[in-house]
Regions:
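Hydrophobic residues embedded in beta-strands of well-ordered beta-sheets
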Residues: 104-105, 139, 148, 160
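Sec-dependent N-terminal signal peptides of Gram-positive bacterial secreted proteins and lipoproteins
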Residues: 13-19
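Broad, structure-driven detector of short, well-ordered beta-strand segments within folded domains
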Residues: 91-99, 146-156
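Bacterial N-terminal signal peptides that target proteins for export
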Residues: 2-11
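Short Gly/Thr-rich strand-loop-strand
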Residues: 73-76, 121-146
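C-terminal motif of bacterial Sec signal peptides marking the signal peptidase cleavage site
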Residues: 20-24
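Short, low-complexity, Pro/Ser/Thr/Gly-rich segments in the mature regions of secreted, periplasmic
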Residues: 152-168
Length: 168
């Protein structure tokens, strides 16, 4: 009777120890970040932002011009948000489309803070600067016909948003 009891306990202990042994003997570090969180871009590509465009136009642009992003969500029905992400955690682009006609009216691009200089310089070259607060990373730009407003906002120490909004 005692031998069966000890055998059961020994088997249970072996089952509990096996995952620890295999995990500790592996070369992978489970606490290691996937990818380099400080990946700096050489060239920043703007997300698709032609207001009034449809979902298919956005998907086509993303597939051709922004290959580091992959589509992760699409909701249909009354509201059609379209979400793309990179493999780098919180980087991504959220597209919002109108319930009435399915046209694009808002884009939110989340980028790493390490790339803020590259992004801000690009926006300064291609749009009219309306206001700037470098300390808080809040910039406001507009396009030539003032039909769109582009704003930037710090969302954390490691990320910031670039928002494209249609002006009605």
């Amino acid at each position: 009777m005692k031998m069966k009891k000890y055998l059961s306990i020994a088997i249970l202990l072996m089952m509990m120890a096996l995952p620890v042994v295999f995990t500790s003997c592996g070369n992978d570090d489970p606490t290691e970040d996937i990818g380099n969180p400080e990946t700096k871009l050489d060239v920043w590509t703007e997300p698709f932002h032609i207001m009034g465009a449809n979902v298919d136009e956005v998907k086509s642009y993303m597939a051709q011009s922004m290959k580091r992003y992959r589509q992760v969500a699409e909701t249909s029905g009354d509201n059609i948000p379209l979400t793309y992400m990179t493999g780098q955690g919180s980087e991504g682009v959220l597209y919002s489309f109108s319930r009435l006609d399915g046209s694009l009216y808002s884009v939110i691009d989340t980028e790493r803070s390490v790339n803020r200089g590259l992004v801000i310089d690009y926006l300064k070259k291609h749009y009219t600067l309306v206001s700037a607060d470098e300390a808080s990373l809040q910039y406001c730009f507009t396009n030539q016909d003032k039909s769109m407003v582009i704003t930037t906002m710090k969302v954390s120490d490691s990320h910031f948003n670039v928002n494209y909004s249609l002006v009605y």
